Amino acid sequence: MIAQELEVSLHMAFVEARQARHEFITVEHLLLALLDNPSAAEVLRACAVNVDDLRKTLTNFITDNTPTVPGTSEVDTQPTLGFQRVIQRAIMHVQSASNGKKEVTGANVLVAIFGEKDSHAVYYLHQQGVTRLDVVNFISHGVRKDQQSESQKAPDGVEESTAEGQQKESALDQF
């Protein structure tokens, strides 16, 4: 049900949170782990994300805002409700999709993160210019963000013909 690559990413997120003695593992921890997930990283690159900048921003946010557990005993890091909802949302989406896919990948979790509208993870993705639509377009249709902007531009011939048309008299003036 969960792809091996996603299991590794989730495990690494928990290990890093535990080593940093964080009391909670958050959606931001999850997004940080997805930066190293092959399927999620491919989607982020296709959406023109500066991965290094996003990694630095997330690391700083997590360091500054995640409560830590004092002492030297082993830490029992707990997932936040937002973290749990993201994973559940990704699983439910894959189960309900009728495209024959059975495994949840990092790309599916990336889409599910956008459901947590009030999270800093979504805010940082929006800062990078990424929307849920960009991610879904790439996953579903292979449309890269840079291809979207090129296809929205008018063809060269259209611009020239309109410029020539403005120099000619309008149909009403010709009448």
Question: Positions of the model-derived regions?
Answer:
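Histone-fold recognition with a strong bias for associated Lys/Arg-rich disordered tails
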Residues: 1-175
